Each structure stands twice: as structure tokens, then as C-alpha cells.
Amino acid sequence: MSFDIAKYPTLALVDSTQELRLLPKESLPKLCDELRRYLLDSVSRSSGHFASGLGTVELTVALHYVYNTPFDQLIWDVGHQAYPHKILTGRRDKIGTIRQKGGLHPFPWRGESEYDVLSVGHSSTSISAGIGIAVAAEKEGKDRHTVCVIGDGAITAGMAFEAMNHAGDIRPDMLVILNDNEMSISENVGALNNHLAQLLSGKLYSSLREGGKKVFSGVPPIKELLKRTEEHIKGMVVPGTLFEELGFNYIGPVDGHDVMGLISTLKNMRDLKGPQFLHIMTKKGRGYEPAEKDPITFHAVPKFDPSSGCLPKSSGGLPGYSKIFGDWLCETAAKDSKLMAITPAMREGSGMVEFSRKFPDRYFDVAIAEQHAVTFAAGLAIGGYKPVVAIYSTFLQRAYDQVIHDVAIQKLPVMFAIDRAGIVGADGQTHQGAFDLSYLRCIPDMVIMTPSDENECRQMLFTGYHYNDGPTAVRYPRGNAQGVALTPLEKLPIGKGLVKRHGEKLAILNFGTLMPEAAKVAEALNATLVDMRFVKPLDDTLILEMAAQHDALVTLEENAIMGGAGSGVNEVLMAHRKPVPVLNIGLPDLFIPQGTQEEARAELGLDAAGIEAKIKAWQA
């Protein structure tokens, strides 16, 4: 997509923040309007995160107008809302390539631009990093400002509060901006409150406050009276008591779509000392009515026609694995009142919408709090219930200690339904489910299952749910199922694989949903094909049998080779002193960038042609 100068005349003048700061302030509302329209035009053509960026247009313009970026450090939490930031920082003409192979990264990325101070993708990291950056700048004597932008969802995470508690203790010079888009702009976000925010952040008020503290520091009763009076005045109009108690100077809430007001407030706050907190109210999806009405649906979008106001409907093909899980969850809950389902803010992505509606008293969205989700599940299990934690592979990493300390050590029957395992695609390095087999396999008493299709996935969910001797995990990929027939639910024998095809000389031991590719390769090479099913416990007997009957073995998994299922097979063979050649095929020792799942698998040699080529090259 080429940039249309005639359609966006003001935006055409801005390809860097230096050019932005040359614009007269009066032209900024027009710039915001053009930026929002350009974002709509670009993302609707290319796909990507959508509604969040529409809500941060004015904030982005104001921040880059007031602060001397990239010298001043601007940190975006998660990064869904950072598309306008990318457009204004030299990437305007490439925004149509975002999330595509070889294109712009889906999130702020240090290797992409000097304006991207922190590489992100996961939630609630900005304030912790911001404190470190601010402290480093202070120790180096660099007169630079540090600003962190965090959303109302991300700030609920414990890590954000841990960081704010630390900031209140060491008091670095930094600004945290809470982008609150949970609701429409409330009544107290109007002219009076904006004026008050500018007054409270202004030099006169700050000087009076600090001067008063110094003058009356030796008169404790008067000093305490001043403090109480200040808190009373601010408390009448602002909900910032919590942040004040953490040691921040709280300002807000203010209208996050008033670019001129934001500039005034940011200028006032820019040189204040100590940790500052600005609370802005925005509308997710701002400027595009369908996204304003349904920001969840329009959070991330495929290519669509903006004039229709609708996203394209699915082709009605095969269900995704998330739906397979969601259907099983509802089916099981209808039969067992002990089932409790937990998600850390991923209801839609994990296929739990229907469950949340049918069984609201047994559905728990704990917000972005993976650590709490796991230990909460442990508590439910102790109380006699059957918790199922639905979580993405990449997010389960954040609760690793809880899996070990609070669940596995106590042998609690918590089941982890691990979605987005393996290659995820367009969200790139931060979201690939590359490590779960490696980091779970070493935990004692953990049962780990890798289904090869949707029917096996259901059977494994059923098996894991009814296993009472410790935690279980079923990992399944992003994307559609394979269309196999669904059979009645029954428990699988723990730790037992299944030979799918008998061949000669070579045996392929497959773990998971690469089975269709493995079947093609086995046919082409006349190899034996085994559906291993369990990563832990491994079917040692079957592995040794395959080693005795074949000249070589190949293990196949969509997980990091290091420490993965293939490593487990190697350990079994070495423990039994079986010197059989083994080729481990899986994800290499690198962070896999964005692109479609098909593109990534082809590049990594994990499609049928690539797997066959790897085996032939190894055998040569």
C-alpha cells in the first residue's frame, strides 16, 4: 500500500518525531484525525491489532510532541496500542506489513527502531523496566525523561504493583500513564476536571505544595493539616488514593482524546520530581463506530472492508482446537458440578465464552494474573474441586514457580489446558509456544499429553481431568482441527503410545499435531510411524521396541529441541545403553519471528517436504 499524500496532507508532513514537533499546535487535531483514518485504512488491508491503537492516537501525538523522543524514553506496555507510535516514528509507509513475514514487528521491538525502548508482547512489564531505565539515566547524569504507558488491564497484574511499590520507595523521576479504556469517558472527565488536572500538575501548585512542606516541616500539626487538606481536595474529584499511597503524585482522570489538554498536562508534569501518575480515559476503537461498540471483536482483526462495519465470517470449515476444548469443557461441566474453569484474561482466545455464559458460577477470569490463576487452582483442588486452567503456552511461563511449588509438589489434581502450543504465527517471538514441553517435562509427577488430532485431544482432556494422582497438561496448537471423527470419551492408558504404521529400517516417533506431515513422510520413506501421545511418562517399552526393530529413530515435535520430547527419548535410550542413531526434529535454538504458521513451518523445515529433506540429509 502506497502512502496517499492527498488523502493525508498533514500526516504526510510527519515521518519522524522531529517533524512532528515542527508542526504548529493548532494542526494537531487534524493530524490526529488523519492518523486515525490512516490506521483504519492500513490495518483493514493488512490485518493486525486494531481497536487499542484507535484509542491512543491523541496520547501518542501528545507524548511525541512534548517529549524529546527518542532521547527521552517512551515505553509501551504489551504493545497492542503502539501502532500510531510506529507510524509517527519513521515506519509510516511500512505499517501495512505489520505482523507479516519480513515486515514490521507486531509490538515495539528494540531491533526495529531506536524509538522502541523495550521489546514487549507480554503484559505488565513497562513500569519495572521504566524504573530501571530511569535509575540508569540518573546514575549516568543523563537529563532524560522516562514515560511508561500501561493499560487498565495490564495494571491489574501483580508485577505492575510490585514495580509501583518499588518506585514509591526509591522515588525515581518518571511518569506512568494509565490508559483507562474500560468504559466511556465518565462525567468527571470534562472541562472542570481537565482544568483541575492542569492546575494540580502545574508549577504553581507544585511549588506551593513543596514550599509549604519545607516551611512547616518543623511544625508537625500544621504539616499534617496541610497533608490532610491536600488529600481531601484531591480526593473530592480524583480516584487516585491507591496510587498516592504507593508513593506517586496522581493526576487525573483526564480526557485522553483531547490532544491539546494532554499536551498542557504533559508539559506541566514533564519536569516534576519523583514518580508521577497520569490517569487518562480513552475509548477503545475511537473513531470507528463498530469497534467502539464491540472492542473485543475488533481488538485484533483480519483483513476487512471498513465500509461494511463487519469482520468477515469464518468459512464454516473445521473448528479450532480452542473450540474443541470449549465444547469439551461445557460437556464435562454439565455432568460434573465439581469442575471449575480458570483463565487469566483469555476468555475469547481460549474458547471459554459459552462456558462463561452457561456456568457463570464456575467460571473465573482472574485477569492478567497467571501466578494467581495457578495457585488459586491449587486451592480449589485442596477444597475438593476439579480445576481446569486454560492458558496459552507462552503465558504459562509466567507461573512456573506456582506450577512446581503450589501444584506439583503437593500432587494436586489440577489440569492445564495449554492452548497456542508450538508455532503461533503473526505475533512473533513473544507468543510462540516453544518451551512448554521443555519446562514441564522436568517436573516430578507431571503427566504431559500431546494429541495428534481433535479426537485425541478430547480423550486426553477427559483422561487428564479424571487423573487424581497429580497435575496433568494437555497441549494443543493454534488453528483448525483436522476433521477426524469424534468418538465417545474414554480414559487413555497413561504413558502408552500407539503404532500407526509399520515400516522398515526407520521409525518416526511423533509428539502432537505434526502427525499429518509425519504420515506423509512415513509413507514416502516406508517408515514406521508412532503416535507417542505422552511426553511424560514416556512409553519406554515402545521406544526400546522401536530401537530394537529399526536401524534409526526420528523424533518429531513442535517444541524446542533442547529439553523437549526428543531429549526424553534420547535419555531413555542412553539409560538402557541402546546405541541407536536418533535425529531430533523440532524448533531450533532461536526465537521464531512473525509470519503465518505455514510460512514458519516451511522455513524451519517442519512441513512434510522439510521433514523428509532433514531425514534424507541426515541419512546421507
Swiss-Prot record:
GO cellular component: cytosol
Pfam families, alphabetized: DXP_synthase_N, Transket_pyr, Transketolase_C
Binding-site residues, Mg(2+): 152, 181
MF annotations from Gene Ontology: 1-deoxy-D-xylulose-5-phosphate synthase activity; magnesium ion binding; thiamine pyrophosphate binding
Cofactor requirement: Mg(2+); thiamine diphosphate
Keyword Metal-binding included in the entry's annotation: yes
Pathway this chain belongs to: Metabolic intermediate biosynthesis; 1-deoxy-D-xylulose 5-phosphate biosynthesis; 1-deoxy-D-xylulose 5-phosphate from D-glyceraldehyde 3-phosphate and pyruvate: step 1/1
Binding annotation for thiamine diphosphate: 80, 121-123, 153-154, 181, 288, 370
Classification via CDD domains: TPP_DXS (cd02007), TPP_PYR_DXS_TK_like (cd07033)
Keywords, sorted A to Z: Isoprene biosynthesis, Magnesium, Metal-binding, Thiamine biosynthesis, Thiamine pyrophosphate, Transferase
Catalytic activity: D-glyceraldehyde 3-phosphate + pyruvate + H(+) = 1-deoxy-D-xylulose 5-phosphate + CO2
EC number annotated for this UniProt entry: 2.2.1.7
Any Gene Ontology biological process: isopentenyl diphosphate biosynthetic process, methylerythritol 4-phosphate pathway
The protein's enzyme class: transferase
Annotated InterPro entries: Dxylulose-5-P_synthase, THDP-binding, Transketo_C/PFOR_II, Transketolase-like_Pyr-bd, Transketolase_BS, Transketolase_C, Transketolase_CS
Co-factor note (free text): Binds 1 Mg(2+) ion per subunit.
Family stated for the protein in its record: Belongs to the transketolase family. DXPS subfamily.
Subunit structure, interactors included: Homodimer.
Function: Catalyzes the acyloin condensation reaction between C atoms 2 and 3 of pyruvate and glyceraldehyde 3-phosphate to yield 1-deoxy-D-xylulose-5-phosphate (DXP).
Protein name listed in UniProt: 1-deoxy-D-xylulose-5-phosphate synthase
Lineage, uppermost ranks: Bacteria, Pseudomonadati, Pseudomonadota, Gammaproteobacteria, Enterobacterales
